[in-house]
UniProtKB/Swiss-Prot annotation:
Family to which the UniProt record says this protein belongs: Belongs to the GLTP family.
GO CC term (a single one): cytosol
Membrane topology, as annotated: Peripheral membrane protein
Chief location: cytoplasm
Binding residue positions for an N-acylsphingoid base 1-phosphate: 56, 60, 106, 110, 150
Leader sequence segment: none
Protein name as it appears in the record: Ceramide-1-phosphate transfer protein
Length: 214
């Protein structure tokens, strides 16, 4: 996990999510998790604003690394294989978190929800005018996604923290792919891949009634 401290570059995230789907449209966990490592570097580059999310994501990545290197690692090559294995062997807590608190299905679900927030936020930044306030874009995206799963006190603290976000221009330049215009071009290329991965994951979880795991 040492690479989480290295400098963020949007292109690394793009490459990972491009490689995330195979010809069967299975979500390959190696590249999914690599994409998330890139996104963690992005969150960290913005300072402490997103630390509440990035710290949780790092914990989830560590859990998945353990599963993918453990005795049942052959079942954790893709999201589809993982779901089939864990659901088929009753390794998922469907009603309350008890026997299997750190199942792969629950762990990836948390990453999946956070990915939706980032996808919406970056899409908002991509399509917004130059004078748009990133704090408003981020808050709107959060309210449409992650806020549903957080208690009021966290929602309040988070929306206050978002007010410290930089201007749209500075935010785009922090992606380290050149000018703000070049960053928008890179988002144009990257976001469809992230959205496709999200949609396939969402459908898979819905088919197995896993979207509301405790």
């Amino acid at each position: 996990m040492d690479d989480l401290e290295s400098e963020f570059n949007l292109k690394v995230v793009l490459v990972s999510f491009k490689q995330c789907l195979n010809e069967k449209e299975e979500v390959l966990l190696e590249y999914y998790l690599a994409g998330w490592r890139g996104l963690v570097r992005f969150l960290n580059s913005l300072g402490t604003i997103f630390s509440f999310i990035s710290k949780d994501v790092v914990t989830k990545l560590q859990i998945m690394d353990q599963l993918r290197s453990g005795p049942q690692q052959e079942h954790y090559s893709s999201l589809q294989a993982m779901v089939a294995y864990e659901v088929g062997n009753q390794l998922v807590d469907l009603e309350r978190r008890s026997r299997h608190p750190d199942s792969g299905c629950r762990t990836v679900l948390r990453l999946h929800r956070a990915l939706r927030w980032l996808q919406l936020f970056l899409e908002g930044v991509r399509t917004s005018p130059e004078d748009a306030r990133t704090s408003v874009l981020c808050t709107d995206s959060y309210n449409a996604s992650l806020a549903t799963y957080h208690p009021w006190i966290i929602r309040r603290a988070v929306t206050v923290a978002f007010c410290a976000l930089p201007t749209r221009k500075v935010f785009l330049e922090s992606m380290n792919v050149g000018s703000s215009e070049q960053a928008v071009e890179m988002l144009n290329e990257a976001l469809p891949f992230i959205e496709r991965v999200y949609n396939i994951s969402q459908k898979l979880y819905a088919e197995h009634a896993l979207l509301d795991l405790p």
